[in-house]
Every structure is written in structure tokens, then in C-alpha cells.
Amino acid sequence: MTALGPKVTVQESPWDCLNFVSMRHDKKPFDDKRVRRALSLALDRYQGSTALSKIAIVKEVGGILVPGTPYATPPAELEKLAGYGHDIKKNREEAKRLLKEAGVPDGFAFTFKNRGIPMPYEPVGVWLIDQWRQIGLNVRQEVIEASQYHGLLKRGDFDVAMDFQCGFIVEPDLDLARFVSTSDANYGKHKDTVIDDLYSRQARTTDIEERKKLVRQIEKRLLDEEAHVIYTLQWHRIIPHLSKVHGWTITPCHYLNNQLDAVWLSE
């Protein structure tokens, strides 16, 4: 890249893909929201972003919608959610307190199942295990062959597992549908009529500002109050191309803008 200099243009964008942690709500101790919340509080997402973005296709610290898009929560507001504050020492002290309160002993061991795809599952999985170790948890990673992994999630053959999604457009109806209680993709099997109602209301309203408020309420309940799932870091697209290529603009989704009908070459 350096050798080519101005002959190459690099476009970057947050990606409408991410890995998050699903926990079975019908298996102890993950049926206790204090434990789930502690697992999120343990994560230093900001240090993780700095380190992992150098070796993996993840970068932005985000909530339930792609950072920088219309329905995404601004950073200052996001930082109020459990696990998103910058004081990691305080966060981890709270995590340890919650685990103790929930009766989880120091050194508690569990298996984290991960999808057998190197990027970015492997580095993100290693990072998660290291973060949880720092609140006194002993986590073993079990890597499952990629072709078998979706079936494992559908069967519920896990206590804690890496989950994932990629959207074809940044839209709350699509990105949040899996968190409705009756969704086939609700692999943690949480039952939350509050989220169900909020999801239905945000889908029906035609008032953009009202919809943003409803999406924020879903986010707070999903990631903070109930900690049904744990978001890691947003994937990050980096697309280099020859500078003589014009008319192509990166999007948050790799499914879009590939027809190339507006692309032209200056030489």
C-alpha cells in the first residue's frame, strides 16, 4: 500500500456485522441477570477496540445499531450502559460484587463455545476469555466446526456461546428482530414482553424521533437492565482500490452497492 501511494484509495466504514455473546437463560447461573451483567461489565471495550482493530476486522464500540447511522446511540449516551463506561476498574469491581451476590464463587468455570472461523471469531473469543479471567472466572473455549455451529445454536447445545449477525441494510426492524421472545434466532431463549412490546411500537411509529426513543429503550433493556446478550465490537470494513476507479462508495453492508453500474475509470 505504501509503495503504491496515491495510486490507491482506501475507504472505511463501520460494518453491519458483529459478534455478540448469547447465554442460555434456562441454565444456571446464566439465568441470573446479575451474572450476565457481570460478564458485560468485565469487558474493556475501548482498550479492546484499540488492540483488536490492529489484528482483526473489528473496531467501533457500539450498541444495537451500527455506530454513526441514524438510529445509533451517541457515544456519550452509550457510555451510561453497563460495560460501556470508561472506568474499567470500577466496572470490574461491580462485576465481582454482582457475581458474589449471585452466589458465583471465585474461579467459577464454564465453557465458551465459538465458531470455527479464524476472523474475527478467534481473536474476539480469546479477548473475551481474557477479560472474564480478570473478574475471577475460569473459561475454557471450545471451537466448533463452522458447518456444525448454526445447528448447535439452534439446538441450544451451549451455556455461553459466540453469536453473530450481518444485516443487508441498517434498519431496526431487521437488526433487532432476533431479540423478540418468539424469534427462532433468540438462541439464549430469553422471554421479555417489554422488549416485544417496544419492538412492535418502534416498527409501527412514523415519527422518527419517537422511534429513536423506543430503540434506545430496547437497547437499555437488552444490554443493561436484563443483559440478555453481550455485544462485543462492531466489524469494520476496509476496502482499498485503485484511485483511477471512481463512482463507488463504501456502505455499512457488503451485500450492497456491488452492481458497479455507476463505476468508471479515469484512465
List each language-model region with its residue ranges.
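Short, well-ordered beta-strand elements
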Residues: 107-117, 140
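Short helix-loop capping/hinge motifs at secondary-structure junctions, enriched
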Residues: 26-35, 205
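Immediate post-signal peptide segment of exported/extracytoplasmic ligand-binding proteins
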Residues: 33, 92-111
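Loop/turn elements at helix/coil->beta-strand transitions in domains of secreted/extracellular proteins
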Residues: 5-8, 32-36, 45-48, 106-109, ...
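Detector for C-terminal structural segments
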Residues: 11, 18-19, 42-76, 116, ...
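Short, well-structured beta-strand/strand-turn elements
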Residues: 133-147
